[in-house]
Curated annotation (Swiss-Prot):
It is found in: Cytoplasm. It comes from Zymomonas mobilis subsp. mobilis (strain ATCC 31821 / ZM4 / CP4). It is an enzyme of class 6 (ligase). Belongs to the class-II aminoacyl-tRNA synthetase family. Keywords: Aminoacyl-tRNA synthetase, ATP-binding, Cytoplasm, Ligase, Metal-binding, Nucleotide-binding, Protein biosynthesis, RNA-binding, tRNA-binding, Zinc. The gene is alaS. This is Alanine--tRNA ligase.
Length: 890
């Protein structure tokens, strides 16, 4: 059997004899690329060569590059140990041409290596090409003699590679190995392509274009080649196994782990041994390349990798620090190819030993407290359940570990007392939950959390992943199974689906599984803040608790959520920048369609302020700076300048999002926005695309609200407004630029016409009051002891009634004037009383009588002038009669 070391060596030697320079692996920490946490692909060290920023003394190269994918978008950490091909550390074999050979030569070299040098059966190989790349399609037929049905055209981005929004790019061609029909799965491009039967072993990237901008792509004057072959994958193929962890290197590390812990390497401990083997490689190489455990950045990623392995070491029963004792096995397998491992042996061992010792301190603290609590007990005694619960609740010391520790001393734990203490805590928590206004039916989540714990969220760096169903809820009750057509809530042990929290709506997507299972996820909630509940409908198939499933987030929906959520952070920073540091977030809502942001401010924002805020946010988007995430304690985060967001609850560890750039008080570049946030975000601000404010309103006293859209929604919103503007311009028979002035002129003419009409109506009413033609019995008449003018006027602006009352008072020196105008069925009434009579007669009393007749309520004013109205304009004449009747009694 060919070993992994022999495969690596034969790959490099093959390309060396074909004119390539063997280039040693670059360190895992990128030397000239601040956008990357770790080198994660073979081409990374050559990036500046491909872009023309640097030159090399050779035109072709080959390498075996160390890579780590445990942070950023290439995060495989959560799947490691549970799948056949996920790793944190891996080696990428590659050959590169910097303007030398192109498609034909790279296909010749690739086919020659895998079929002639390594002897792979051509009948087990198929390739993919980009759907428009006819050149590559024809070359595969010519060079490899592959039939057309094994040259698969793919139209997705899987077969088109780009370095970013701009820069070198081009189509890809991937080589797949067929493990045979006994392995589930279909060829690439088929519905079941995610199965394990067809495995990609080599990706050939044809860099032939320069992406200038979103609309422009030019041919490169010197096309280049970048290829990548995962060493672990090709080793599994050449060694005749279907699982990378069954290859020689991993088998040796796993065997060492089993030997040191005296445990079986399969069965219940299989995944744990695999995690330890993989993470040992990652930790060893990272320390050798200068990364040390820390609470942020690369050091924090290393610490996560280490502690994940150390947790699994504890699970398999390791009583002492294990990881550092596995370093000799790592050097035995990989030290020859990577002498830096040998040089750093002492540092690697000491770093692992110290970190595991510190990590185990939590357990040690718990055991010490347990010893203090049991020193007075004798053989056969029982530890009170309340003590065991305090160990669990306060110190995180599991009940099972307490029981195991006491068993050796012939002591037991009062489990009933422990359960009672646990139940009492649950009761208190549920009472608090009910007191918060939540539905009583939500108690079901406490049962699930108590029995199964929370859901592990893997979606910060992944949109798809595997999971196991641990609970099902249908019609508010837990069930064991569900079938096609059921509306079901699914809880899994882990998920990439974000559950609604912190103002951000939940993810949607698809869940698939065996036997063509398909479920559509329409929402994801997060009850109790730690369970991810997938709200779904079963489109096809059946499910039961314990089923393994695949979860795929709707990437378009997720990306829109990311853009809107990151935009709220930028908006917050812009508001503080433009309005002052008094601005703080008071609430938010982030959906895929839009965002809403509530903030403290005492007055409405001017158009100029809104424009400045919008411009500042869009400038940060155009700058396209990278968004960075650090995991820190809340105290450290606040000390670092992070703002805590309204309504968020923070645990012992928080995510700190930094985005944008600005100059600080020391004239140094710093992040524009630094906030604590648990939501999902873009990786670079340019992914937001565009930001546009659609409204600014008041929520309550001192609280304002901005609603905005981003990306495609912003574009569509602006397109819609542009269409309305053009339609308005067409109606006005003007060009769009003239709409404001033309509209202002029309409104001015309308105001003039309305004033002229009001003046004419007023003049007519006065003429009637003077006994002119067309009068409506409006001449003064005697009512009781008083002079009275009463008139109903159709269509008069109610605002003109008061002035008309004053004009009529000049006609009668002492008396009462009652005027009613009717507009669209509604009546408005005004009554005036001469100054000489206001002590005897109140205009307010008279108006209220008229308003009552008109079907209204109230009415008010002064004794000499009062107004009111009612909906029954057809009762206007009767209202005047009611006023006269009241006046006769006065």
């Amino acid at each position: 059997m060919i070993t992994t070391n022999e495969i690596r060596r034969s790959f490099l030697e093959y390309f060396e004899k074909n004119g390539h320079r063997i280039v040693p692996s670059a360190p895992l920490v990128p030397q000239n690329d601040p956008t990357l946490m770790f080198v994660n692909a073979g081409m990374v060290p050559f990036k500046n060569t491909f872009t023309g920023l640097e030159s090399r003394p050779y035109k072709t190269a080959t390498s075996s590059q160390k890579c780590v994918r445990a942070g950023g978008k290439h995060n495989d950490l959560d799947n490691v140990g549970y799948t056949a091909r996920h790793h944190t550390f891996f080696e990428m074999l590659g050959n590169f041409s910097f303007g030398d050979y192109f498609k034909e030569r790279v296909i010749e070299l690739a086919w020659g290596l895998i079929t002639k040098e390594w002897g792979l059966d051509p009948e087990r190989l198929c390739v993919t090409v980009y759907h428009t790349d006819e050149e590559a399609f024809n070359l595969w037929r010519k060079i490899a003699g592959l039939p057309e049905d094994r040259i698969i055209k793919i139209a997705t981005s899987d077969n088109f590679w780009s370095m970013g929004d701009t820069g070198p790019c081009g189509p890809c061609s991937e080589i797949f190995y067929d493990h045979g029909p006994e392995i589930p799965g279909g060829p690439p491009g088929s519905p079941d392509e995610d199965g394990d039967r067809f495995v990609e072993i080599w990706n050939l990237v044809f860099m032939q274009y320069e992406q200038v901008n979103a609309e422009t792509r030019l041919n490169l004057p010197r096309p280049s080649i970048d290829t990548g072959m995962g060493l672990e994958r090709i080793a599994s193929v050449l060694q005749g196994v279907h699982d990378n962890y069954d290859t020689d290197t991993f088998k040796a590390l796993i065997a060492a782990s089993g030997e040191l812990t005296h445990t079986a390497t399969d069965g219940q401990f299989k995944a744990s041994h695999r995690v330890i083997a993989d993470h040992l490689r990652a930790a060893g190489f990272l320390v050798a390349d200068g990364v040390l455990p820390a609470n942020e950045g690369r050091g924090y990623v290393l610490r996560r990798i280490m502690r994940r392995a150390m947790r699994h070491a504890h699970l398999i029963g390791a009583k002492e620090p294990l990881m550092y004792r596995l370093v000799p096995a790592l050097l035995s397998e990989m030290g020859m190819a990577y002498p830096e491992l040998v040089r750093a042996k002492a540092l690697i061992e000491e770093t692992l030993r110290l970190e595991e010792t510190r990590f185990r301190q939590t357990l040690a603290n718990g055991l010490k407290i347990l010893e203090d609590e049991t020193q007075h007990l004798k053989s056969g005694d029982t530890l009170p359940g309340a003590v065991a619960f305090r160990l669990y609740d306060t110190y995180g010391f599991p009940y099972d570990l307490t029981a195991d520790a006491l068993r050796a001393r012939n002591l037991t734990v009062d489990q009933a007392g422990f359960d009672a203490a646990m139940a009492e805590q649950r009761k208190a928590a549920r009472a608090a939950w009910k007191g918060s206004g939540e539905k009583a039916s939500d108690e079901i989540w406490f049962d699930i959390a108590d029995q199964l714990g929370g859901t592990e969220f893997t979606g910060y760096t992944a949109e798809k992943g595997s999971g196991q169903i641990i609970a099902l809820i249908k019609d508010g009750k837990r069930v064991e199974t569900a079938k096609q057509g059921d509306d079901i809530t699914i809880i899994t042990n882990q998920t990439p689906f974000y559950g609604e929290s912190g103002g951000q709506k939940g993810d949607i997507g698809v869940i698939t599984g065996n036997n063509d299972l398909k479920m559509t996820v329409t929402d994801t909630q997060k009850p109790l803040g730690r369970i991810h509940a997938h709200i779904a409908k079963i489109e096809k198939g059946e499910i039961k608790i314990g089923d393994d499933i695949q979860l795929q987030v709707d990437i378009n929906h997720r990306n829109r959520l990311r853009a809107n959520h990151s935009a709220t952070h930028l908006l917050h920073a812009a508001l503080r920048d433009q309005l002052g540091q008094h601005v703080s977030q008071k609430g938010s809502m982030v959906s895929a369609e839009r965002l809403r942001f509530d903030f403290s401010h005492q007055k409405a924002l001017s158009d100029q302020e809104l424009a400045a805020i919008e411009a500042e946010v869009n400038q940060q988007i155009l700058n396209n700076s990278v968004v960075t995430t650090r995991l820190m304690t809340p105290e450290s985060a606040v000390e670092a300048g992070a703002m805590a967001l309204f309504g968020e609850k923070y645990g012992n560890e928080v995510r700190v999002l930094s985005m944008g750039s600005c100059l600080n008080d020391q004239n140094e570049e710093s992040s524009w926005s630094v906030e604590l946030c648990g939501g999902t975000h873009v990786s670079a601000l340019g992914q937001i695309g565009l930001f546009h404010i659609v409204s600014e309103t008041a929520v309550s006293s001192g609280i304002r609200r901005i609603e905005a859209v981003t990306g495609e929604e912003a574009r569509l919103w602006l397109v819609g407004r542009d269409r309305l503007l053009r339609e308005t311009a067409s109606i006005l028979k003007a060009v769009p630029e003239e709409v404001p002035t033309r509209t202002a002129a029309i409104l001015d003419e309308r105001r003039k016409s309305e004033r002229a009409l009001a003046d004419a109506q007023k003049a007519l009413a006065l003429a009637n009051a003077n006994g002119g033609q067309g009068g409506n019995n409006a001449a003064p008449e005697k009512v009781g002891a008083y002079q009275f003018i009463g008139q109903v006027i159709e269509g008069l602006d109610p605002k003109a009634l008061r002035g008309l009352i004053d004009e009529n008072k000049k006609i009668i020196e002492s008396g009462v004037i009652a005027l009613i105008t009717v507009n669209e069925g509604r009546a408005s009434v005004a009554i005036g009383v001469s100054d000489s009579l206001k002590d005897k007669i109140s205009a307010v009393d008279l108006v209220r009588k008229a308003v009552e007749t008109l079907g209204g309520k109230g009415g008010g004013g002064r004794p000499d002038m009062a107004q009111g109205g009612g909906p029954n304009g057809n009762e206007a004449a009767q209202a005047l009669e009611a006023v006269k009747a009241l006046l006769e009694k006065a």
